[in-house]
């Protein structure tokens, strides 16, 4: 017997450079597919597990991780649902611990802290998945360590194509720093032998990762590429390795120039020397004079004017230093072409208008960081056999340093020759405060800041990872104006004390810890300096909030940030506690463990007559604020951000108060809130979140003054009946979801882009709806009073998504032309005629009891990719579907009898995955089933051709699947058996260059007709035995059914599942290594049925089948050549159904001796027909065969051959054989 294919990995494992760890259901067909393509275009060999239901067995995947050099760990929302992802992550951590793997974490629409600390739904899914698993602790360690590596963040504002390029660049950079396997500089060798890669008698250089840095810098200085004089700036944060890089550059390049000079420590020298000494020092180095004078430069100028010079200036810190050297720099630029000047600084602004290009020194990658740390931690004993015992602790220090070379050097030196107990103790101390030697490095840059910049730096540390606009707004309302705040952020960015990424302000962890240390030192001195309090132990003492030691210290408290999740005991707050805090700007009582901030038990006891005279407060966050209103003495004159979720408030404050700076208000789930009158003067308000304020009935008319309001969330305000007439010109997002008493929607802004009216009581849209020319999303789901959609909706030229699900009384959809409409959801409506919109890509008509047929013109909807017809119980037939349709879901169409012939047009070049689902279509006629199977066969054949032609079958993936009621394996499957297991023997060269994919089939029966499931998946695991008797297992999906939207359903009838997957990667490797060898292969297949993540014992595989699919030979002119694998055995069964479906199948058997020549049939355009044999087995016994006449068939063969129907000719030939 014979089967599909897979190559062995034990014999010749593929040398993958990059392994991608990701959750397939989230990212496979979007982000990851683009990333894989980009990596391959850059000649980077990448491995991914290609199947959603887990393609490879875990041991194979773990082996792939070990064989890889780099891992991309992509954390997405549903990552922790998969135990496979987490076990891969555990392996990744182990390999990085051993120093054999570089991990690059990618946070896909997640915060790194969410992953690291397992917060929110991400953490909830992990705890649910890992419940009761003894490996939970190890997994948590992996989540704690891997996300701490400097990674790449992709949020909602990111342009994914740009992020893909950034990842590819990071991978290429990492690969260049990884020595070839077997070289002396490989990580394993470097960790085991301090002399690896060094010449005899030479001490190994104490830095790592400089080779690629030097190469990148040299590219910017290239004398062949850039003929003129060139000035390059080398920039980066303090301690990042600029000085080391420049010394290496100078050492390498000085021999290329007749005159060269290196002036280092310019920052320090400028403090002890007059600035006019700098040009004298430089000129002296260039001219080789001991005491040159700038006043008399004629001789040095004339001497050097015709020479190419190299000048390296290190640690430039002020504009005055540049100005002092300007005359000489200008002279160099005017001199002979080919000179090079390199200026290193930690202040990017100093290079503006001076340099031709800039090189930014980045953090070290994980591998270089580990090597550098180990070099200094074991500097006198590199061959220490106990080094492996320190590996886990080493990882902790490396993660702490986050690729910062100086920190790695300092920490390694402090731990050299120390015991493991000392290492553990040091790690605990670092959690409290950074090393003084690290602090001193940053202190130099901090001391050079102005007072305003220092305050801005320390304030930003309190709000890192927040939007830049938000941070600048907080700073602008402090001692700085708007322009000054923006200038402060830019200055700190230029000095690399902060950085902006995707619109957010970030700060390196070491700088963040440094900022806290600065505040702590300020408190421990005389108490006269303003400070910010982060640690709860500094805020709460003895069961009371006791920040104050005296009035002077209270007056200098600038911020209080209390994490309520860390408050274990009941704590009392005195009514006069804040009375002396006149300078308090930031007050936050929050919960870091619950992002939605809803589960906290409020352990802070607050008196009713609390005094809150906080005139200077800019940010007020108080989770579950217990009072009905803010105290009367509260003055919001400088308030920018007010967040009081789940509060007991009825109104903000009594009367009107000036709020000229207020921009963000969040009062979500304040269920007693009934008045918003306090916001009547908040004319600069931009975001207002009132979700879940169930008592709120109306908006004040004064809110029409909010001309800057862009976001208004009223979701779940169940008492809200209407909105006042107003024109909020900046409003872009309006959410009224679940406002069940809201009856009439007035047009309150012409600029709305996203409008959510789902679950409201509105019965019609406003008459002037056509004014919403920027509207992109309109959601009216579950508007049960809505009876019609006005034709003027067709005038909304920007509308892309229209959701009308469960609008039970909606019977007619107007004939409109919305040229950009991509998504139309009409499920649960009473519409009788399907609308035809040429641009629609996703159309949902499910749960419609009125539609009995679909329009024939649907085949012309070339953009339609997803058609949902689930539970359309009156639907009796479907017409031909368009060629680009990727998913058809007709589950539960109980009246469906017929389908079009052909079912859908197939484009010869299409490569998209497609799924056609007909589960629980109990009245489907036999002719319809035969057309579905015929379509599946044609689809497999054309897909094999397209994949081979357009990507050479490089990427293995599931390309087509279908399922429908039935009990037989289609006749075009070459191998069939009863039961769930199939054993085959494949002939020599079965894996030749034309093998494109594998077609699989399983007949599944439900043992308990009353059983209900939400998901059903059929997978096939097959093992291939090669000539060395080793087995390789490979798993791929056959087909699946999922009940979307929750709930469960019965699968009562037997169902046929057919799936086609492109050639697996392991087969490709086997093919490349053994294409000329003649090796028979044994294979076995096992089909299983799972519900969710575990095998479902209530479902049984009755029959199964296999066919290998081959693409046409590129040297032939036929449109397609399909060849079938054949069996070495005694049984024979023919295939007699052509591609066009016109030839009916017959079954039978011949019992033939093994020594007979059984040859496969492959028909080309030259008309030559070779013999082919095919076998069908029933429990290992051959079935009986009835022979058919040959004369009519011979005539038909000639006609078919003339018409180019090659596959029909093949089937006839086999039949007559």
Swiss-Prot record:
Its EC number is 3.2.2.6. Changing residue 112 to A/K: Loss of cell death. Keywords: ATP-binding, Cytoplasm, Hydrolase, Leucine-rich repeat, Membrane, NAD, Nucleotide-binding, Nucleus, Plant defense, Repeat. One of its GO terms (molecular function) is ATP binding. The keyword Membrane applies. Changing residue 26 to A: Loss of cell death. This is Disease resistance protein RPS4. It comes from Arabidopsis thaliana. The lineage of its organism: Eukaryota, Viridiplantae, Streptophyta, Embryophyta, Tracheophyta. The gene is RPS4.
């Amino acid at each position: 017997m014979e089967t599909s294919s897979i190559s062995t990995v034990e014999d010749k494992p593929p040398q993958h450079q990059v392994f991608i760890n990701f959750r397939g259901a989230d990212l496979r067909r979007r982000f990851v597919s683009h990333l894989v393509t980009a990596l391959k275009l850059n000649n980077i060999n990448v491995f991914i597990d290609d199947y959603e239901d887990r393609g490879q067995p875990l041991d194979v995947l773990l082996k792939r991780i070990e064989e890889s050099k780099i891992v991309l760990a992509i954390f997405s929302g549903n990552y922790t649902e998969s135990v496979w992802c987490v076990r891969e992550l555990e392996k990744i951590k182990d390999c990085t611990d051993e120093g054999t793997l570089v991990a690059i974490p990618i946070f896909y629409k997640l915060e790194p802290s969410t992953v690291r600390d397992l917060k929110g739904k991400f953490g909830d899914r992990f705890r649910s998945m890992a419940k009761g698993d003894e490996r939970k602790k190890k997994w948590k360690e992996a989540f704690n360590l891997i996300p701490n590596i400097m990674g790449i963040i992709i949020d909602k504002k990111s342009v994914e194509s740009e992020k893909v390029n950034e990842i590819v660049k990071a991978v290429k950079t990492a690969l260049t720093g990884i020595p070839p396997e077997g070289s002396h500089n490989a990580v394993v060798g470097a960790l085991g032998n301090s002399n690896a890669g060094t010449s005899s008698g030479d001490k190994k250089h104490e830095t790592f990762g400089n080779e690629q840095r030097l190469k990148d810098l040299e590219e910017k200085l290239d004398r062949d590429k850039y003929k003129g004089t060139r000035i390059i700036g080398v920039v980066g944060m303090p301690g990042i390795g600029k000085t080391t890089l420049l010394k290496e550059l100078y050492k390498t390049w000085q021999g290329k120039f007749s005159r060269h000079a290196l002036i280092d420590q310019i920052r320090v020298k400028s403090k002890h020397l007059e600035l006019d000494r700098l040009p004298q020092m430089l000129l002296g180095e260039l001219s080789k004079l001991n005491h040159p004078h700038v006043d008399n430069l004629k001789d040095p100028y004339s001497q050097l004017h015709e020479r190419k010079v190299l000048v390296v200036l290190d640690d430039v810190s002020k504009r005055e230093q540049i100005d002092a050297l300007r005359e000489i720099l200008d002279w160099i630029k005017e001199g002979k072409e080919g000179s090079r000047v390199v200026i290193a600084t930690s202040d990017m602004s100093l290079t503006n208008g001076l340099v031709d290009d800039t090189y930014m020194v980045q953090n070290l990658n994980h591998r270089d960081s580990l090597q550098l740390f180990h070099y200094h931690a074991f500097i006198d004993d590199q061959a220490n056999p106990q080094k492996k015992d320190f590996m886990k602790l080493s990882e902790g220090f490396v993660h702490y340093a986050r690729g910062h070379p100086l920190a790695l050097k300092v920490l390694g030196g402090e731990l050299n020759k120390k015991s493991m107990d000392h290492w553990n103790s040091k790690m605990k101390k670092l959690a409290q405060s950074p090393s003084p030697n690290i602090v001193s490095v940053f202190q130099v840059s901090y001391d050079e800041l102005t007072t305003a910049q220092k305050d801005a730096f320390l304030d930003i540390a309190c709000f890192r990872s927040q939007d830049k606009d938000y941070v600048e707004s907080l700073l602008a309302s402090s001692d700085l104006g708007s322009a000054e705040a923006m200038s402060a952020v830019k200055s700190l960015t230029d000095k690399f004390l902060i950085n902006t990424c995707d619109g957010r302000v970030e700060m390196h962890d070491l700088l963040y810890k440094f900022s806290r240390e600065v505040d702590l030192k300020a408190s421990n001195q005389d108490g006269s300096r303003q400070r910010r309090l982060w640690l709860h132990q500094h805020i709460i003492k003895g069961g009371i909030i006791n920040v104050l030691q005296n009035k002077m210290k209270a007056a200098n408290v600038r911020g209080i940030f209390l994490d309520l999740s860390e408050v274990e005991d009941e704590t009392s707050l005195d009514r006069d506690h804040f009375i002396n805090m006149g300078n308090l700007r930031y007050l936050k009582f929050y919960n870091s463990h619950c992002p939605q901030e809803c589960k906290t038990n409020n352990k802070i006891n607050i008196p009713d007559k609390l005094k809150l005279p906080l005139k200077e407060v800019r940010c007020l966050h108080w989770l579950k604020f217990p009072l009905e209103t803010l105290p009367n003495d509260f003055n919001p004159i400088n308030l920018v951000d007010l967040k009081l979720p789940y509060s007991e408030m009825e109104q903000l404050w009594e009367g009107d108060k000036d709020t000229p700076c207020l921009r963000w208000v969040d009062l979500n789930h304040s269920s007693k809130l009934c008045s918003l009158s306090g916001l009547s003067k908040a004319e600069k308000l931009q975001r207002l979140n009132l979700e879940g304020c169930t008592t709120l009935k109306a908006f004040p008319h004064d809110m029409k003054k909010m001309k800057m309001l862009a976001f208004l969330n009223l979701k779940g305000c169940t008492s809200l009946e209407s909105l006042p007439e107003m024109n909020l010109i900046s409003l872009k997002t309006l959410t009224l979801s679940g406002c069940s008493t809201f009856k009439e929607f007035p047009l309150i802004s012409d600029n709305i882009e996203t409008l959510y009216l789902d679950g409201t009581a509105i019965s019609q849209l406003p008459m002037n709806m056509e004014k919403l020319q920027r509207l992109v999303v309109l959601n009216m789901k579950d508007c049960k009073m809505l009876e019609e959609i006005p034709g003027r909706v067709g005038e909304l030229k920007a509308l892309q998504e229209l959701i009308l699900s469960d609008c039970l009384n909606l019977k007619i959809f107007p004939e409109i032309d919305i040229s950009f409409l991509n998504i139309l959801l009409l499920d649960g409506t009473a519409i009788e005629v399907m609308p035809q919109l040429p641009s629609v890509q996703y159309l949902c008509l499910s749960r419609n009891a009125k539609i009995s047929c679909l329009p024939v013109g649907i085949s012309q909807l070339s953009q339609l990719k997803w058609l949902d017809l689930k539970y359309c119980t009156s639907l009796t037939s479907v017409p031909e579907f368009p060629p680009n349709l990727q998913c058809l879901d007709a589950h539960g169409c109980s009246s469906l009898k017929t389908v079009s012939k052909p079912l859908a047009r197939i484009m010869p070049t299409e490569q998209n995955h497609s799924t056609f689902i007909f589960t629980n279509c109990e009245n489907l006629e036999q002719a319809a089933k035969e057309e579905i199977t015929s379509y599946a066969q044609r689809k497999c054949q054309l897909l094999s051709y397209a994949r081979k032609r357009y990507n050479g079958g490089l990427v293995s993936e599931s390309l087509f699947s279908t399922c429908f009621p039935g009990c037989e394996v289609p006749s075009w499957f070459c191998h069939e058996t009863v039961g769930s297991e199939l054993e085959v023997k494949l002939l020599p060269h079965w894996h030749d260059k034309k093998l494109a994919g594998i077609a699989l089939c399983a007949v599944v029966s439900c043992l308990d007709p009353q059983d209900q499931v939400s998901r059903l998946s059929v997978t096939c695991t097959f093992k291939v035995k090669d000539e060395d008797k080793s087995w390789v297992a490979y798993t791929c999906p056959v087909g699946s059914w999922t009940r979307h939207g929750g709930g469960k359903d019965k699968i009562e009838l037997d169902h046929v599942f057919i799936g086609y997957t492109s050639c697996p990667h392991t087969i490709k490797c086997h093919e490349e290594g053994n294409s000329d060898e003649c090796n028979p292969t044994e294979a076995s297949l096992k089909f299983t049925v799972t519900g969710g993540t575990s095998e479902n014992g209530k479902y049984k595989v009755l029959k199964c089948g296999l066919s290998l699919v081959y693409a046409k030979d590129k040297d032939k002119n036929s449109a397609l050549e399909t060849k079938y694998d054949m069996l070495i055995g005694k049984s024979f069964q023919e295939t007699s159904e052509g591609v066009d479906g016109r030839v009916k199948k017959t079954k039978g058997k011949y019992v033939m001796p093994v020594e007979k020549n059984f040859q496969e049939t492959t028909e080309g355009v030259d008309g030559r027909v070779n013999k082919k044999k095919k076998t069908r087995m029933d429990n290992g016994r051959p079935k009986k065969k009835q022979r058919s006449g040959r004369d009519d068939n011979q005539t038909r063969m000639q006609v078919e051959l003339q018409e180019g129907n090659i596959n029909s000719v093949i089937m006839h030939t086999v039949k007559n054989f």
